[in-house]
């Protein structure tokens, strides 16, 4: 059983977000695919950082990229990449701020230890030197240990990013599409999860995954565009018209215009993607 606590997104109710976060083990952070990172997004992310919650990023309203902004799948991929960079920049600022505070505390602590050691050395130096002994200076303070920041960032290949449309009831992760294409492409799911997002391309002839440096001048679509976004765009173009403004009304009855979008929902229901 999963208990969900819905908190208001308006900045005037940030205290309610703060209260709710203290009752939770994790947080589902929604970001509008069109509007991107706003002040309230930063506030919510900061609260999850302070409370040490495990955040899950949901890029919502993906349908608006198609129906309102009229983006192509390639343009949408570039837009989503920049949005993800903005969110991770916020997380990185939290990490850097905490690191600077930890570094300052460590330096203060080391300074206290050195001062205490110096006082002890001064009190015993005269007797040690009279006996002809040397002073041990090998006991130096340990160096500051850097914390690994790899786990604080959002990345689709880590399965902590969900793309979806709440109004149409669908959402998906890279892991789900990797499961769909595993048998068709003959590539292990664990490998597909790592290459479905980023600068990776599928060779249509050899069915091999290529990095950008092995393209050799060929203009291939990123795998996320080719295997994921192209399919979703095709569904919306067949029903709502997508970025063309015309749906395929000629061969789809009016009552079935949303049938394909329902099919996306059946494959990738929002609740399963978030909590499955």
Regions found by a protein language model. Give the residues of each.
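Structural and coupling elements of P-loop NTPases
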Residues: 1-276
